[in-house]
Regions:
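Serine-dependent acyl-ester chemistry module
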Residues: 1-71, 75-76, 83, 88-91
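Histidine-centered active-site loop/cap adjacent to the catalytic His
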Residues: 18, 79, 93-119
Length: 119
């Protein structure tokens, strides 16, 4: 029997935990002189799923996670690579809603390589 996911559940505590955990990783990295570069998460709601309530909720949460990432980058004066904005949402870049094709992965690598080479 397939379980149904309740899309009305409150996920805000999860976002707080996400932010807290990321801040801990940032703190540990910086204390150990490890340079930190943050990146936003890409999601692509292709035509077959763009109106599905569960996928729309997942996208909403990912967008809020990306805001947390932006906030932490600003708070900690870190480089942020906004891949969610830099990589176009099109089938040539995504196998599904969250996994890149080889072309998409190349674009992701290029985004990070450019920033790493500048640092």
């Amino acid at each position: 029997k397939e379980k149904k996911i309740d899309t009305s559940l409150d996920y805000t505590e999860g976002l707080k935990t996400y932010e807290r955990n990321l801040q801990h990783v940032i703190n540990l990295s910086l204390c150990n002189n490890i340079k930190v570069i943050l990146g936003t998460y890409c999601i692509y709601l292709y035509p077959e799923i763009k109106d599905d309530p569960l996928h729309k909720l997942y996208q909403k949460i990912v967008l809020e996670e990306n805001e947390v990432m932006r906030k932490l980058a600003a708070k900690n004066n870190l480089v942020l690579i906004d891949t969610a904005s830099l990589i176009s949402k099109e089938p040539t870049n995504f196998l599904d809603s969250i996994h890149f094709t080889s072309q998409g992965m190349s674009l992701l690598a290029q985004c990070f390589a450019e920033k790493i080479n500048l640092e």
